[in-house]
Curated annotation (Swiss-Prot):
Induction: Reduced oxygen levels. Heterotrimer of HcnA, HcnB and HcnC. It is found in: Cell membrane. It is a single-pass membrane protein; Lipid-anchor. Its EC number is 1.4.99.5. It holds the Pfam family DAO. Keywords: Cell membrane, Flavoprotein, Lipoprotein, Membrane, Oxidoreductase, Palmitate, Signal, Transmembrane, Transmembrane helix. A three-component membrane-bound flavoenzyme that catalyzes the formation of hydrogen cyanide, a secondary metabolite, by transfer of electrons to a cyanide-resistant branch of the aerobic respiratory chain. This is Hydrogen cyanide synthase subunit HcnC. GO terms for cellular component: cytoplasm; plasma membrane. The lineage of its organism: Bacteria, Pseudomonadati, Pseudomonadota, Gammaproteobacteria, Pseudomonadales. It catalyses: glycine + 2 A = hydrogen cyanide + 2 AH2 + CO2. It comes from Pseudomonas aeruginosa (strain ATCC 15692 / DSM 22644 / CIP 104116 / JCM 14847 / LMG 12228 / 1C / PRS 101 / PAO1).
Amino acid sequence: MNRTYDIVIAGGGVIGASCAYQLSRRGNLRIAVVDDKRPGNATRASAGGLWAIGESVGLGCGVIFFRMMSSRNRREAQGAAVAVDASTPHILPPAFFDLALQSNALYPELHRELIERHGMDFKFERTGLKYVIQDDEDRQYAEHIVAQIPHLAEQVRWLDREELRRAEPAVSHAAHGALEFLCDHQVSPFRLADAYLEAARQNGVELLPGTNVTGVLRQGRRISGVRTDNAGVLHCRTLINAAGAWAAELSEMATGRRIPVKPVKGQIVLTERMPRLLNGCLTTSDCYMAQKDNGEILIGSTTEDKGFDVSNTFPEIAGLVQGAVRCVPELQQVNLKRTWAGLRPGSPDELPILGPVAEVEGYLNACGHFRTGILTSAITGVLLDRLVHEETLPLDIAPFLAARFQPEPAAVAVAAC
């Protein structure tokens, strides 16, 4: 069976779904979303944090990973302190701050639009994010963060011990205080992806679940379609690579070059439902916590280089639970509902890979978002829509182009139409 579309989007996670929705809003394109639903979709590894500043300065998964590496380095240095300075990893460059803040600003209107036009509610909540300071190294890390973002001083607030206790009564009284990010909020990650896809479907996008791209067709330098395992050949003029942790494989098929995207495993814990315990999202050097609208608390997340493995492991889950209980002692009496793992699409510099490549016309990247896919999904969809329509972009995407990696050509043959 052969079908013809203007655009094929490979990947139905939150990034591909956002692209599908934004591109479908004009009603002038025939679009298909191809998604294999392989285990480990990155949306599964997310707390749903819209932590525009928090993620940009390395909180959430970033500070957990930093403290893990810090502990290892300290052991190797036989107890010597680890410096927190300008070389500290995970504080992302200014270009990402711009991307993140612009994306964050889109969510209130996006939330209203998806509810009113499509009946889909992804549970946007204005919660703020607090980095709970539990020891001197946490404070040093927090001070370093503040020093890096003087231009965002109005969005950051120090809470002393008493102020933290008033804001979050459940937090351990041993905590020294917190650094609060006022514009960082949360959504339900699963409902966000579903909302994008359902709205896109209502706008006429064809969803092809359980379908995998097995080859890419080209006429000379131009994309002309894809081969799939279950839906035959899908002819198109534009292919968007939103394949998440599998994006490198699709890039190689489409361009002959393998972009440096690899899976980064994140394990997650979910509690039973309970009355409101947390007033906002919390992150520590051990874990992050977000209580959802149904009362469940999501606790995450590890950062592991384990290939495509999505199994849960006791030491890592126990570490998350212990970190959560250290911060919020009442959680010691709470039952765990389930655990799981997802695969974030990591890039070497932790920045997404967006936009065209010089070698192939009609191919666009929308991948490599690592731990910020939920946050940046809104702006990614807008950017891809404007790229397809050759319109002015709201920000410079040069820092996010695949060309920054200068990958070597792969020894593959690209199928001809």
